[in-house]
Amino acid sequence: MKVIVVKNQLEGGKIGLDLLKESINNGAKTLGLATGSTPVEFYNQIVNSDLDFTNMVSVNLDEYVGLDGSNEQSYRYFMTKHLFGEKPFKENFLPNGKATDLEAEAKHYDQIIEENPIDWQILGIGQNGHIGFNEPGTPAEITTHVVDLQESTIKANARFFESEADVPRKAISMGLASIMKSKNIVLMAYGKEKAEAIKGMVEGEVTTELPASILQNHANVTVIADEAAVSLLSK
């Protein structure tokens, strides 16, 4: 696991863009994408770049249950606003949070990932160590699944909604096994509130109690983090 320490999100976004360009030059065709505040500057860098995604496919990590793509809090809306609206892809895949049969939708999404192996995956990390919506206790072998969101995740995401009560309680998420199939993974983390999770992920033991720690078992992981996020690392 390679750790790159940056001054701020702007520098992190630029380094992320360089890594993405390198991967595309090496033949990457499918990008795994994440949402939330962490990758926004990275997406800004992409939008202002000369990259062309019209022959590429994107696969997003997750989506809230109950929100359709026109809802401003849905992850499809987020992706359209920050990336897809400016940089069209050949195809964009996100879980369908309005599916009538959520378990069938999860299986369908596994099939999409099988047909579109992810070459380059961007990740954030939650304060509790979640990646995607894989909360503490999630089995390592799980693929796409329906998740009951933990209170800490609901509280962390409440800032994007009018009130905490409006935050969906469920999501569909790629599983840890799905994420681990990605050829290359770049995880971004900013701020001191991520420091405990980063320490556990990089230096702790691999445990389901800190889902991101499974990334220690992946051959190609790069962490882009600011000084605050790496402040608890011993080396």
From Swiss-Prot:
Tell me, in a sentence or two, what this protein's role is.
Catalyzes the reversible isomerization-deamination of glucosamine 6-phosphate (GlcN6P) to form fructose 6-phosphate (Fru6P) and ammonium ion.
Query: What pathway is it annotated to?
Result: Amino-sugar metabolism; N-acetylneuraminate degradation; D-fructose 6-phosphate from N-acetylneuraminate: step 5/5
Known Pfam families for this protein?
Glucosamine_iso (PF01182)
Active site, renumbered: D62, N128, H130, E135
PROSITE patterns reported in the protein's UniProt record: GLC_GALNAC_ISOMERASE
Q: Which organism is it from?
A: Lactococcus lactis subsp. cremoris (strain MG1363)
Q: List the disulfide bonds.
A: none
User: Which of UniProt's keywords are assigned here?
Assistant: Carbohydrate metabolism, Hydrolase
Q: Recite the lineage of the species.
A: Bacteria, Bacillati, Bacillota, Bacilli, Lactobacillales
Q: Which CDD domains is this protein grouped with?
A: GlcN6P_deaminase (cd01399)
Q: Which GO terms describe its molecular function?
A: glucosamine-6-phosphate deaminase activity; identical protein binding
Return the broad EC class. Answer: hydrolase
| Protein name per its UniProtKB record | Glucosamine-6-phosphate deaminase
Regarding protein family, the annotation reads:
Belongs to the glucosamine/galactosamine-6-phosphate isomerase family. NagB subfamily.
Q: Name one GO cellular component term.
A: cytoplasm
Q: Which GO terms describe its biological process?
A: carbohydrate metabolic process; glucosamine catabolic process; N-acetylglucosamine catabolic process; N-acetylneuraminate catabolic process
Could you tell me the EC number(s) of this protein? Answer: 3.5.99.6
Locate the transmembrane regions by residue number.
none
What is catalysed by this protein?
Answer: alpha-D-glucosamine 6-phosphate + H2O = beta-D-fructose 6-phosphate + NH4(+)
User: Which InterPro entries does this chain map to?
Assistant: Glc/Gal-6P_isomerase, Glucosamine6P_isomerase, Glucosamine6P_isomerase_CS, NagB/RpiA_transferase-like
